[in-house]
Amino acid sequence: MRHTFTLTNGVEIPAVGFGTYKAADNTDEAIISEAIRQGYRHLDTAAFYFNEEAVGKAVRESGIPREEFFLTSKVWKDQLGYDSTLQEFENSCKRLGTDYLDLYLIHWPRPSDLNAEWRDLDVETWKALEDLYKSKKVRAIGVSNFLPHHLNNLLERTSITPMVNQLEFHPGYIQKAAVDFCKQMGIQIEAWSPIGRARVLKEPFLMELAEKYQVSVAQICIRFALQCGVLPLPKSSSSERMHQNMDVFGFDIEENDMYQLMTLPQIGWSGEHPDRERVRF
């Protein structure tokens, strides 16, 4: 059975994607090829990941038709603006070896935490994405790491509502205000870092749930995202864990357990925030 989420424009996305950021040093292509062998068809990359060529090569060498894949890329924050975004889109397509993308995102809403012109830059960048979408070069457009005030800037000044917003989301860091806002606007949330960091994997309640449901802690995290209506983008360099991370449709987390997961104290935050310099732990 094929599990998908459906965007507001009717485009379907495989319900679990494969995150490719820092998959492993110098072995991106092998890892992505293995992910494809394990059944992943939704691959998430970005110009900043410096692995679009590896993703494209793995897709081509898989022997699976391009249209069976869902490819996402993103414009980096130092290339915001109308003309530079159009050029960056073409560069990403060239590196990926494709003439279209399934989803293209603005990676971050601000070039830096000190940049005061981000509102106008975001609007110019979004208008470039709108034109790419209207010209059918991309099947869906969206943003990443946008909070409600960043989104409102676009909603008030442009014509197409973002279809996707990628956010850090995992037990212990669910960004409820941003997620609720996106749901109200019909914006699909995708979760980067859906498994969180080491502290999440060692959280006693999550370990207790893993034993209760006879799955891994990572599977609990991924299933939690899905039951919240969030599309997870786990990453792994292990074939076994790749398989486990896809094997999350044979159980449901009970309601009371979901409530406890949603109200965990903050753990595992990456330190990344769109309006602040990164917090180092």
Language model features: what each stretch is:
Residues 23-26, 44-54, 78-83, 112, ...:
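Acidic-and-aromatic substrate-binding clefts and catalytic sites of carbohydrate-active enzymes
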Residues 85-106, 131-135:
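CE4/NodB-like, metal-dependent polysaccharide N-deacetylase domain
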Residues 42, 100-103, 140, 164:
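Residues at the N-termini of beta-strands
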